[in-house]
Amino acid sequence: MRLRISEAVVLFLLGAVAALIGDHSHVVTGTTVYHTDAVPFVWSSPFWFPILVGAATASLAELRLHLPAPRDGVTARQALGGVAAVVGTYVTTALVHAFPVVPVTALVCAAAAITWCVLGDGPGAACGVVIAVIGPAVEIALVQLGVFAYHPDSDGLFGVAPFLAPLYFAFGVVAALLGELAVARRPQLGPPVCDTVSRGPGAG
């Protein structure tokens, strides 16, 4: 494991909080409806939802550190911008869920592309692709199990919203960047100090 436990916990909590904000936006606007009350809820979400997203955040960050050439020049400012971009896009999907599917999906694709162009790299895109496949697949399975449903105007991808793929892609790019930042901010050990004294010619 490349992440330290403390770093993984921070990333888990960050992902969980962002998930709660986005999911609350989906629930209050009717983008999604949960059909279960058998488990405790945290705000508007069943307790397992922020756990899944938090775990995905830490896992994607860890994955990035196993891919080639993690960047050591990423900054907290970039990370803040990335998190804001993903949460903002997530909330935007809640506000436009009833609009025609093509412009909504194109809008989210554009936001995801900009996020990658500004903040990502090749391995970060790979992380984005991984979660862009896994995330919607998990949601499709949960919809088929009757756990929740998307609004009829937003369920064109096997029962889930087509905008999920680019939204998850942006999430993967930013989670990868967060992993790079976690390593880049670790205290750097300086070069060893030589404690020998140079002696002039003929010195005893």
From Swiss-Prot:
It is found in: Membrane. Keywords: Lipid-binding, Membrane, Transmembrane, Transmembrane helix. A 1,2-diacyl-sn-glycerol binds at H26, Y150. The keyword Cytoplasm does not apply. GO terms for molecular function: identical protein binding; lipid binding. It is a multi-pass membrane protein. Its main location: membrane. The chain crosses the membrane at residues 5-27, 47-64, 76-97, 101-118, 124-145, 162-179. One of its GO terms (cellular component) is membrane. The KxHxx motif mediates association with the coatomer complex. Belongs to the INSIG family. Diacylglycerol-binding protein. Homotrimer. This is INSIG protein homolog.
